């Protein structure tokens, strides 16, 4: 729970600077409309009760003049980088604890690894949201015949694929120190975690919309509480994927060891069954 709380807190601290950076980037490189659609594509993954937090912030940033956006982006970059770095440090610490790593990284190496993972996660998030936006634009222009033929016209399929790829790489390269986690274990953990993330998002939406009325208890901060609940459930899913990858790795190791033992016994029996000649 300590790791889940740390990741959730720093994710909450980093998400608004990330939205500001995305909008500023598209304002400079492309246009405001694309930036708005990109931000809305990201907002749709959170429960409906928490979307108001982001929608009001996105509308404010879209309407703000360029010089204010530039100044806010500089501050957002500093705050977001700090929060993302600390959040991914908590993720890596939790995963290494789950994997039962005894050989810990040094201070510099651990911080560098967390920084690299944060950069890769931000790039992957931008690519996936861009793919989702592209699919939407193609649906609007009725140009999805090729993708429909290949079964690639669903935006949720691209989001799920991005989750699987990102989590698989996380478990493969960042969870173990002494050696890499096998690909089969990493992929199994990535697929399992991605499925759990989808289920957790759906269950959280049902919980906060139909089971409890958080607004009556928490008032104006109810949306923040909803977002924290959603974050904590999804972080638990990521850690469960790490545990699943670890168990698959152990099972693969035991299977290989049993096969090696059986082969050794077979060779020993074969050598004993060979006729011996005494001269």
Predicted regions located by residue number:
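Membrane-embedded alpha-helices and immediately adjacent juxtamembrane helical segments
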Residues: 1-279
């Amino acid at each position: 729970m300590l790791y889940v709380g740390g990741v959730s807190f720093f994710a909450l601290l980093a998400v608004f600077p990330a939205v500001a950076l995305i909008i500023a980037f598209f304002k400079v490189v492309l246009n405001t409309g694309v930036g708005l659609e990109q931000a809305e594509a990201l907002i749709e993954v959170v429960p409906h009760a928490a979307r108001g937090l982001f929608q009001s912030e996105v509308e404010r940033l879209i309407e703000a003049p360029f010089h204010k956006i530039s100044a806010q982006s500089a501050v957002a970059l500093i705050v977001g980088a700090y929060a993302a770095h600390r959040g991914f440090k908590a993720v890596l610490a939790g995963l290494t604890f789950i994997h039962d790593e005894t050989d810990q990284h040094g201070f510099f190496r651990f911080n560098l690894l967390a920084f690299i993972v944060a950069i890769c996660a931000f790039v992957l998030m931008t690519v996936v949201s861009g793919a989702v936006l592209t699919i939407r634009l193609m649906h609007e222009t009725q140009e999805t015949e090729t993708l429909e033929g290949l079964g690639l016209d669903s935006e949720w399929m691209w989001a799920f694929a991005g989750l699987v790829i990102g989590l698989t790489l996380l478990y493969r390269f960042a969870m173990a120190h002494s050696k890499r986690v096998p690909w089969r274990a990493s992929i199994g953990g990535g697929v399992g975690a991605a499925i759990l993330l989808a289920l957790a998002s759906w269950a959280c939406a049902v919980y906060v919309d139909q089971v409890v009325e958080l607004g009556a208890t928490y008032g104006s901060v109810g949306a923040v509480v909803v977002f924290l609940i959603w974050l904590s459930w999804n972080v638990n899913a990521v850690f469960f994927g790490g545990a699943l990858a670890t168990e698959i790795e152990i099972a693969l190791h035991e299977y290989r060891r049993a096969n090696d033992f059986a082969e050794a016994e077979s060779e020993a029996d074969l050598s004993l069954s060979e006729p011996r000649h005494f001269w």
